């Protein structure tokens, strides 16, 4: 399992990619593999406020429904609408096609508090 080095990670298996003043968020390869085949993704509306460690959406797989937890505080500025018609992107391409939301962070320094790729890899090996 390849863990991209340029991202930050939460304990709930979300990734964050800094893009200028914004942050792109999705779920990790580890998370999608644990969930199995994704059949539906529910995401917030543009303009919604998300709060760190609180649910901002959910993914439904053939096995279960799992909540998505915000890794940082911020305002949703973009939602990946491709996931409405193609939720399988989460399984096929969790770091590219299956990003979930783009957020304008309330405090960009929160991102630095998330795990590095190395720390995330250690955590997933313990699970």
Curated annotation (Swiss-Prot):
The glycine cleavage system is composed of four proteins: P, T, L and H. The glycine cleavage system catalyzes the degradation of glycine. The H protein shuttles the methylamine group of glycine from the P protein to the T protein. Is also involved in protein lipoylation via its role as an octanoyl/lipoyl carrier protein intermediate. PROSITE patterns: BIOTINYL_LIPOYL, LIPOYL. Binds 1 lipoyl cofactor covalently. One of its GO terms (cellular component) is cytosol. This is Glycine cleavage system H protein. CDD domains: GCS_H. GO terms for biological process: glycine decarboxylation via glycine cleavage system; lipoate biosynthetic process; protein lipoylation. It comes from Bacillus subtilis (strain 168). Belongs to the GcvH family. Its cofactor is (R)-lipoate. It comes from the Bacteria. Keywords: Lipoyl. InterPro entries: 2-oxoA_DH_lipoyl-BS (IPR003016), Biotin_lipoyl (IPR000089), GCV_H (IPR002930), GCV_H/Fam206 (IPR033753), GCV_H_sub (IPR017453), Single_hybrid_motif (IPR011053). The modification N6-lipoyllysine is found at residue 63. Residues 22-104 form the Lipoyl-binding domain. Disruption phenotype: Strains are lipoate auxotrophs. The requirement for lipoic acid can be bypassed by addition of both acetate and branched-chain fatty acid (BCFA) precursors. Signal peptide: none annotated.
């Amino acid at each position: 399992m390849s863990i991209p080095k340029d991202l930050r990670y939460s304990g709930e298996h979300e990734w964050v990619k800094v893009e200028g003043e914004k942050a792109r968020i999705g779920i990790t390869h580890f998370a999608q593999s644990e969930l199995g085949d994704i059949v539906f993704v529910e995401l917030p509306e543009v303009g919604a406020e998300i709060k760190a460690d609180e649910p901002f959406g959910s993914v439904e797989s053939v096995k279960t429904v799992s909540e998505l937890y915000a890794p940082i505080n911020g305002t949703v500025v973009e939602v990946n609408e491709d996931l409405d018609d193609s939720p399988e992107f989460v399984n096929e391409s969790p770091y590219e096609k299956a990003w979930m939301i783009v957020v304008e962070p309330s405090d960009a320094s929160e991102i630095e508090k998330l795990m590095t790729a190395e720390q995330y890899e250690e955590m997933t090996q313990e699970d």
